[in-house]
Amino acid sequence: MTTPTSTGAPVNILVVDDEGNIRKTLAICLEAEGHHVTAVGNFQDAVAEASRRTFHMAFVDLRLGVESGLDLIPVLLSGSPWMKIVVITAYASVDTAVEAMRRGATDYIPKPFTPAQVLLAVRKVEEVRTLEQKVAALREDLERTAPEVRFSSESPGMQRAM
């Protein structure tokens, strides 16, 4: 499984919220910045879309009707471990923020949010994606140019040191 590339290209974003006006607001805000947005209203549709497409990030509501956005986080990450997930909620608390992070969310935004908060979250994800790519490229360079060197010694003192 490889990490999607980051070339300054638009970010593919999944929006999961049971409120239509929130989905529409996020889609308008993000699409105005050139990003590709798929918006769904429930847990099952989110899982279905994530199985069909590659998303770089997702905005996930904490409460999705009778289901929990917290439960959706590990499901999305199991299929796309590189996906960055931002939890959005009208029921913000320290406990839910901690639980969201424990389950794999990268950010947490309370409602009502501003377009600036949303775009800042996207910028942070873009920066992290760029850094992850640089690290992966450096690891590949290191493996190619400096393969692992194995030392062996019959000296008991050297064997303990290794």
Residues covered by each model-derived region:
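Two-component/phosphorelay signaling modules centered on CheY-like receiver
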Residues: 20-38
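The feature encodes the CheY-like receiver
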Residues: 23, 65, 89, 93
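Short hydrophobic/Thr-rich beta-strand motif most characteristic of the beta2 strand and flanking loop
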Residues: 34-43, 49
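AAA+ ATPase active-site-proximal loops
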Residues: 139-162
